[in-house]
Amino acid sequence: MKVKKYDQFNESVYQAKLANGLTVTMLPKTGYHKTYATLTTNYGSIDNTFVPAGSTELQRFPDGIAHFLEHKMFEKADHDAFQIFGQYGASANAFTSFTKTSYLLSATRHLKENLTTLLDFVQDPYFSTATVEKEKGIIGQEIEMYDDDPSWRLYFGMIGNLYPNHPLQYDIAGTTDSIAKITADDLYAAYRTFYHPENMTLFVVGNFDPDEVLALVKANQDAKDFTAFQPIERKIPETAADGHDIIPYRTIDMPVNRAKSIVGVKGLVPIESGAAALKYRAAVNVLLELLFGDTSADYLRLYDQGIIDDTFGYDFELQNGFNFVTFSGETDDPAQFDTAIIDVLENWRRSVVDQDDALALVKKEMIGRVVFMANSLEAVANRYDQRLFGTATIFDEPAVIDSLTLDDLTAVAEQLLQSQAISEYQIRPQAKN
């Protein structure tokens, strides 16, 4: 078992890779009553074309299958995993993102029983035609609910602009038509391909002894038989390096009282995983704070002019294989909103060049936020992404942020904020009859 010490935080992270390939990462934290765990597979909504385990041919699976599989994992032939967690006083949940699926556990007692339940229910799938058909109705209602959500439509409308030929454009849950095609055999094929321990990580943080937890997990895994791991072959379409495939502008009408607008910027340069990805994320976040933080000159100017208001916000998405930034808000004049945001992006140098004092202040604020998040077990676990950031944890982030210079931000801005990578998407109020 490897140990990585963070003396400045008085924390130690323990990691081991088991014989079956499962990576176990543990962060014991004394003084906490709760323990939080995530069991994650590197399988998300964009992984809809792959070679199923045991096969040699690429196969296209219905959109939404990763999310559908996540929903069905809790249900077994004669019980529901939630019932067992409830018996041991634990809460459980799961989520599917573009690139991964995670199963979450939170408990203040019975850690042995709850960790065992987490491992066992995820590693023992049960799908039948009847239960799959029943789930289609449940997920279909969820999809329809999101289809009626203007904020959701705005966000995925922008993704569709930035990635029109990429599975990113599809809702993580799929569509009612796509999930109607999912079969139990499809779920088993996806499960066998992506839910092998070699493609999964277990992260445990909270009040426990790492030697005891590792022994528990090892014994649990040694008692199970797994087929040999077949390296995963995915087919993810390439996107244009010069951004020529980006849709520059779209608008739709919806029953909203006030227009919504979003400006997006697609990262055109691939980002290497590991330390480079961690630094890139930190640099982009600092850059965005300099440009649009609520004390920045441009933010205050646009706010005073009434171009943006308290509904304004920005988001940076960095996952394995893609990254993009969005700026959105409600507005009475979508064209004016978009023009103002794009002006700030294209004239980023006025917020970066010679702004040493502003940089120092933003870095201090961001380090403070990270240190604060490090006290949250959920934040520590959910920010861990071995596939993207390697062995780095939240405790590596302050040093990375502190090391950033204006030259670093200039390099990132020149790389990311390219005019040909910008797109606009608007939702306007429907005309009243």
Regions found by a protein language model. Give the residues of each.
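His/Glu-rich zincin catalytic helix
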Residues: M1-D80, Y188-Y191, Y195-R301, V412, ...
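Charge-rich, well-structured scaffold segments of protease-associated domains
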Residues: K17, D80-R234, G274, K279, ...
